[in-house]
Amino acid sequence: MSSDSLHTLGRWTSDRAVATPDRIAVDDRGVQLSYRALDARATALAEALGTAGFGIGDRIATITGNSSDQVALFFACAKAGVVLVPLSWRLSPAELASHLAASRPALLLVEDEFTSLADAACELLVDGPPRSTLGVGGIESHVPPIRREGMRESRPVRDDDPLLLIFTAGTLGTPKGAILSHANCFWTNLALSRTAELTSADVVLAVMPQYHVGGWNIQPLLAWWVGATVVLERTFDAGRVLQLIPDRKITTMMGVPANYLFLAEHPDFAATDLSTLRHAIVGGASMPEPLLRTWHARGVALTQGYGLTEASPNVLCLPDEDARTKVGLAGKPYPHVEVAVADPVTGEQFSGAATGELLVRGPSVFSGYFEQPEESASALRSGWLHTGDLVERDSDGYYRVIDRIKDIYISGGESIAPAEIESVLFGHPAVADAAVIGVPNARWGEVGVAFIVARRGVATDAEDLTAWLRERIARFKLPHGIRFVDSIPRSAADKILRRSLLADYLSHAPSNREPA
C-alpha cells in the first residue's frame, strides 16, 4: 500500500492510525473502534484478500445494514484494489438477484439478519457467488479462495482503479451499477471539505444507508479522512436520533428532507438539546421553506444541494447563508466541478441565464456503468455527464432543478423508476395498461401514483394490485395511490405522456398532495 497512488483511499486509515491512533473512528451502536484498530483490521483483511487471490477490480458484494464491519471491509478493499458492491437490503429477492447477476461478485457477504433474503435471491440465480459473513467471525477470520483460473495482476492500487459499484435506478427499470474510482471519491470529498468543512473534533451522525453513495461520500468518508468520529445508525428513527444528538454530542449530520420533517414533528423535538448540532446537510430534494425556518429557529445551519450517484454525488451546493434567501435553489457548483446548461435535443450549450439539461464534468464524475457500454455512452458524451435533469440558471449563476427529463422520481431520497413498477403491473391478468408517475408529497417529497386501465371481465381493485406489487417489488417503491382510468395518454410513438397525467392529477387533487 505504501507505493499506492496518492489519491487512493486505503491511505486514509493508515495516516489516521499514525496521527490520531486513539481517536474513535466509528461508534457502532455503542461499540467503538479507534483509528488504530480500524486500520489494523483493514490492513489484515486486505492482506488476507490478496493471499486468497483477490486483486485489482475483483468485486465483493454485501447485504448488510450500516456497520463498523462494513467500514473495515471498505478500507480493506481500498487497500487491496478490490471493488465493494454494497447491495440494498430493502430490495425484493428478485430485485436483489438481478443486482447480483449484473455485478457478478466473486464473493457475497451477508449479515445474519438478512440470510433469508440472500437465500431467496440466490435461489433465483443459475450460478450464485460463494458466501460468507462480515466481521471478525466471518470474512476477517477466513477469506474463501477466489474461483478463478490464474491470478490477477499484482501491482499497486492506482487512482483510477474502481473502488465502489453503486446501483442506481435505470430508466427502463434495469439495474445500473455506477463505477466510482478512488479518484472520484477523493475529489468529491475534497470538494465537500471546502464547502462543509469537518475537523477531527467533529462527531458525525450517519443515518444514510451504505448502499447509497451518500452513505459514504456525504460526510462519513470525509470524517475518516480528517480523523472525526462517525456514529453509525442502522436505520433512521426520529426518536433515537433526538436521543443521540445530545448523548453523543453530534455536531453534524446528513439526511433527506423527510428525515428532518420527521424529527421536527416528533413530540420530543422542542425539548431536545440541539446545542452541539452546528450544521446539517440536506440531500435528495430541496427543503420546503417552513421546514427550513423550523431548523433555523433551533440554531442549526443547513447546507443544501444537488447530486447524483454518477457524480459521486456532489454537484451543486447551497450554503446556509444562501439558503436563507434563495429558498428552493440548488446552489452553485462545488469546487472542482464544472457544469453547463444545454439544449436536451441538440446538445447546444447556453451561456448566461438559461433553462436546459444539466451537464457535469470533472474528476468526481464516474467512468461508466459496469459492463453496460450503451448506457455508459448515453450518459457520457463528449466528456460531459448528461444528467437528464432540467435546470434553470439565473443571471447570478445559481441553479434550480425544475424537472427531470428522465422519468425517475425521488421519494424520501430513494430513486424510483416508474417503468419497473409498470412492468410488474403489466404482469397482473387484470391490467390492460398502466402508468406510474411521481406526484408532490409534503412528507416524502414525491410519491408514486399508478394509473390503471383494467381488462374487461377481469375483477381487480386497488387492494388486489397493491398486494400483487408487494410480493414483487420493494416496499418503498409501492405506489401511494392507484387510480383506474379509461385510457393512458400516449404520444404517437406510444410514449406515456406523464406530464399530462400529472397535470390532470393535480387539477383534481383537492390539496395537490397525495396522502402519506
Functional labels for PLM-detected ranges:
Residues 6, 149-167, 174, 197-203:
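Conserved pre-ATP/AMP-binding loop-to-beta segment of ANL
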Residues 31, 46-94:
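Conserved AMP-binding/adenylate-forming
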Residues 34-36, 163-187:
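Conserved AMP-binding A3 loop
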Residues 91, 362, 367-368, 375-378, ...:
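AMP-binding/adenylate-forming catalytic core of the ANL superfamily
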Residues 186-203, 211-252, 266:
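Conserved AMP-binding/adenylation subdomain of ANL enzymes
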Residues 225, 247-255, 264-325, 338:
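Gly/Ser/Thr-rich phosphate-binding loop
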Residues 306, 338-359, 395-396, 458-462, ...:
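Conserved beta-loop-beta connector loops within the AMP-binding
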Residues 316, 332-336, 348-379, 416:
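Conserved ATP/PPi-binding loop(s) of AMP-dependent carboxylate-activating enzymes
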